[in-house]
């Protein structure tokens, strides 16, 4: 009757160093197979162990079981070892336990060497990361204070120059407005002079008219005088003719009334005419004086009104010019303030963009550093897990070696065979890793050899 032992499997994938220092990879798989033990008086016992898998970068390490319960009959132990992708099997027959132990020791030495190499690579990688971080610190925080001070000084000088330019522009505008004011005053005075000259010309025309009137009146007076002389001559002639006529009558008529005194009458007439002429002359002079005074009063009143209106116009023009000057100054100040505000906004926006860019770069660097730290932490945890698993395997192999050295394979055909005796003692408790549950061994089942010496 064929006898089969409990089955335990152990396999590991490719294990590659995270830092890339070692260019090769090792792939190991081992299998200890024995399916079950069938005894005449014992029920079959089967043990199973949890599987653990760990990923490291692009490499992987997978262990299906940490501590199998193994039966060692009088034959019945098989291993398989694969290196670099090739598979080969080695069957161990009865009496080849030393070779099996030697191969297991070689595998243990390889695992320990690999663990030591990975620890060295991890330490070198941590030192490289630390050196890189120390080298990157000055670059992450550059000192721009001197440049900022120079920029602030230049900005202050620029602002002072702009303020001085604005002040000079305002002064130039004020000078232009003052020149315009003086030009306006000059034009006003010229217009006043022209108005006075026109008034003088008008008065001269009036004076000429009055002179003409006076000459006309003088001509009339002369004509009246000539007429008076003519009348006097005519009167004398008439008087003489009348005298001649009356002389004869007087001679004839002695008792007649006394004759009229013609000289007296002529004197009276002369006095009357002279009085009339004098009155006319006086009236004409009075009328001329009255008209002249009225015209002078009108001219004076018009001149006063004109002067008051011109003064008011000048005052209004001065007020308008002052308001225009103030308006230009306010416009210039507003333009200067707007330009200063725009420059300040542009400067602060550029500084804000630079700071935002620096913050973004620092955040990106921090994110990269955190990602690297997390990756290194994961790799470190993976290495710790691998180390724990390797220690678990070492303990397993040590238990196997001790059990093989202390016990011999069971033979039921021997005279002193007893079914109650066990082939192997209980293995010590071992753990798969830091987080795996501990599995205690139970007494090993008794192996039954296969008929005909087969297992």
UniProtKB/Swiss-Prot annotation:
Region (Coil 1B): 144-244
Coiled-coil portions: none
Expression tissues: Early expression in the hair follicle, mainly found in supramatricial cells and lowermost cortical cells of the hair bulb.
Listed Gene3D superfamilies: 1.20.5.170, Single helix bin (1.20.5.500), Vasodilator-stimulated phosphoprotein (1.20.5.1160)
Region annotated Tail, chain positions: 405-455
Region (Linker 1): 133-143
Region (Coil 1A): 98-132
GO molecular function per UniProt: structural molecule activity
KW rRNA-binding (keyword) present: no
Keywords associated with the record: Coiled coil, Intermediate filament, Keratin
Species: Homo sapiens
UniProt protein name: Keratin, type I cuticular Ha5
Misc remark: There are two types of hair/microfibrillar keratin, I (acidic) and II (neutral to basic).
């Amino acid at each position: 009757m064929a006898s089969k032992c409990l089955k335990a499997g152990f396999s590991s994938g490719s294990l590659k160093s995270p830092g890339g220092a070692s260019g090769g990879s090792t792939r190991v798989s081992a299998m200890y197979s024995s399916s079950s033990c069938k005894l005449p008086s014992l029920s079959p016992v089967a043990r199973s162990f949890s599987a653990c898998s760990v990923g490291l970068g692009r490499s992987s390490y997978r262990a299906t079981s940490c501590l199998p319960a193994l039966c060692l009959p009088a034959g019945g132990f098989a291993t398989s070892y694969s290196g670099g992708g090739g598979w080969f099997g080695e069957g161990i027959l009865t009496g080849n336990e030393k070779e099996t132990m030697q191969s297991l020791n070689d595998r243990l030495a390889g695992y320990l060497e690999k663990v030591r190499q990975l620890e060295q690579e991890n330490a070198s990688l941590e030192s490289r990361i630390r050196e890189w971080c120390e080298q990157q610190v000055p670059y992450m925080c550059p000192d721009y204070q001197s440049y900022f001070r120079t920029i602030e000084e230049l900005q202050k000088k620029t602002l002072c120059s702009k303020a001085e330019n604005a002040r000079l522009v305002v002064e130039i505008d004020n000078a232009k407005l003052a020149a315009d004011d003086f030009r306006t005053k000059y034009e006003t005075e010229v217009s006043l002079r022209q108005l006075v000259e026109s008034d003088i010309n008008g008065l001269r025309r009036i004076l000429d008219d009055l002179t003409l009137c006076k000459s006309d009146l003088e001509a009339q007076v002369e004509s009246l005088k000539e007429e008076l002389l003519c009348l006097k001559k005519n009167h004398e002639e008439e008087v003489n003719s009348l005298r001649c006529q009356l002389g004869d009558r007087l001679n004839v008529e002695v008792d007649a009334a006394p004759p009229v005194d013609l000289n007296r009458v002529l004197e009276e007439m002369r006095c009357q005419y002279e009085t009339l002429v004098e009155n006319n002359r006086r009236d004409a002079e009075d009328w001329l004086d009255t008209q002249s005074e009225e015209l002078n009063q009108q001219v004076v009143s018009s001149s006063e009104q004109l002067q008051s209106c011109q003064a008011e116009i000048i005052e209004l023009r001065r007020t308008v010019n002052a308001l225009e000057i103030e308006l230009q100054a306010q416009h210039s100040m507003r333009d200067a303030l707007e330009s200063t505000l725009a420059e300040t906004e542009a400067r602060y926006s550029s500084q804000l963009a630079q700071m935002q860019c620096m913050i973004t770069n620092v955040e990106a660097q921090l994110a990269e550093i955190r990602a690297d730290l997390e990756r290194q932490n994961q790799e470190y945890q993976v290495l710790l897990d691998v180390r724990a698993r390797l220690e678990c395997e070492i303990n397993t192999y040590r238990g196997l070696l001790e059990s093989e050295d202390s016990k011999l394979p069971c033979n039921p055909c021997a005279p002193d065979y007893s079914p109650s005796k066990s082939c192997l003692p209980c293995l010590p408790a071992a753990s798969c890793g830091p987080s795996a549950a501990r599995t205690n061994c139970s007494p090993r089942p008794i192996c039954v050899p296969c008929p005909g010496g087969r297992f």
